[in-house]
Regions:
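Bacterial Sec-dependent N-terminal signal peptides
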Residues: 1-21
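A domain-start/cap signature at the N-terminus of enzymes
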Residues: 17-53, 127, 132, 137, ...
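Gly/Ser-rich "nucleophile elbow"/oxyanion-hole loop immediately N-terminal to the catalytic nucleophile
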Residues: 46-49, 96-129
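The conserved beta1-alpha1 loop
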Residues: 55-59, 152, 175
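Primarily recognizes the serine-hydrolase "nucleophile elbow" in alpha/beta-hydrolase
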Residues: 112-114, 120-166
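C-terminal catalytic histidine-bearing segment of alpha/beta-hydrolase fold enzymes
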Residues: 170-174, 180-233
Length: 233
């Protein structure tokens, strides 16, 4: 379990009272919010040498407190019958919340500090809500990641505008053509924008896939091989 506190300072200045005086003032307050994330961490058999770290963000169906849910899809599912010589981090988003980029970033820093991780080989992927979270986290901290793999994720307005912030991150986007939950146009639009400044980007659209375009990606050794070959510039 990971807990993270956010402190905020607000400043309010009042002007123009409606009577015969103008009043100005200063008000300071401290706001504290606590964020708690459960997470699963796979540690490679040999960690004497620095190893890569792969972060997986699940979709909305795996929210909650049952940590086993983060193993239903993605890298942890792959690990049930295969091996990966890397740290695999799968945080769990609480019910009634969505992925918070700053909380995720602080969790990654904690995992880095406590384990023998290669800082130039940190990879980020996610599906559906996790694809959205992966986009947002990559744009918030582009300096951290060596590769990005968003699957069936919607894209916020800011990444659409500031697309070149991740120009140096090799990116593979996947989506189903007949996705009736997250329209494929999200992936098509961000791909076209990123392609102008990121030469190392690809978009794969599965003609026969609905929202679940992730199973065939995460169940395939190729995506892990590709990610682990990438090194941060």
């Amino acid at each position: 379990m990971f807990k993270y506190l956010i402190f905020g300072i607000t400043l309010l200045i009042s002007v123009n009272s409606n009577a015969q005086k103008n009043i100005t003032g200063k008000f300071n307050t401290e706001i504290v919010t606590t964020h708690t994330l459960n997470y699963a961490l796979h540690v490679p058999k040999s960690s004497k040498e620095k190893k890569p770290l792969l972060i997986f963000l699940h979709g909305s169906g795996e929210k909650g407190t049952d940590i086993e849910l983060v193993k239903v899809h993605g890298p942890f599912k792959y690990l049930k019958s295969n091996s990966l010589d890397a740290y695999i981090l799968a945080p769990q988003c609480p019910d009634n919340e969505y992925w918070d980029s700053e909380v995720l970033y602080q969790l990654i820093l904690k995992i880095q500090k406590e384990n023998n991780i290669d800082p130039n080989r940190i990879y980020l992927t996610g599906l559906s809500m996790g694809g959205w979270g992966a986009w947002n986290l990559a744009f918030a901290h582009p300096e951290m990641f060596a590769a990005l793999v968003p699957i069936a994720g919607f894209v916020d307005r800011v990444p659409m505008i500031e697309n070149c912030k991740i120009a140096d991150i090799p990116t593979k986007i996947f989506h189903g053509l007949v996705d009736d939950v997250v329209n494929v146009d999200y992936s098509i639009t961000i791909y076209k924008k990123l392609k102008k400044c990121n030469p190392n980007i690809s978009l794969t659209i599965f003609d026969d896939a609905g929202h679940d375009s992730w199973t065939r990606v995460y169940d395939n050794k190729e995506i892990y091989d590709w990610m682990f070959q990438q090194t941060k510039k």
